[in-house]
């Protein structure tokens, strides 16, 4: 069971595209409606609301043409975005034990999930969840799918709490569970994932999904956000253990082996791990995705990582005006 106590705040969820969703949300739609962002101007037509008339523009046009002309400003609707959280539940995502001074991935994933869900609720979004781990109602390797749903009350945090309860499942998903999840979302009926929907994929990405699985999700117009959860010492790099005896165990912690690495072997592992992270980031960059790199289970650090992601989207003009 993975539970984290305390609040983590929220971050903006800047969309890359105008979305298509349910009315009365907080993001700009591709449809016209009663929002705030101006989509364009046109001549008045019978049935248009009088409040939609741009009186200054109408006065200028009327003066030029010496006749009564009325200009109406069309605006984009404000819609509810969809946010789906995909969690990698491979056994490797249970590392490292909480009593060791390294990244405890279950806590990092829990804080990421809590932050994403709370931020989605803050922006009046629908929140869904998917993983392939075992749960009381499903076995490992089967999709544990909860379609996007809305917050039932503005005075309660039940949607965030419910989403956090999904993390109580096992870390026993197959190696290809992220790929399975992306393909499942493309096939499942009634997923509710419309153009511009967020799909946050939380994983260490040591098992990268095939490019076509990621490309398929992108091709559907979804805003795929990889959340990379890796220990900065053992996975993003490797410590200088040359000449020291160190014990290494398997994922389940059942078998341990003491080895002594040379300086050269430790350096090779460091280079290998750093190149692996660089390759992961390069894959996402080539797909024009904006990943979030999480290296700590401290909620302050998790919040800072997502805040940097949101600010970078604004910096590079990701937000649609």
Language model features with spans:
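Short domain-edge segments at the starts or junctions of modular domains/repeats
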Residues: 39-40
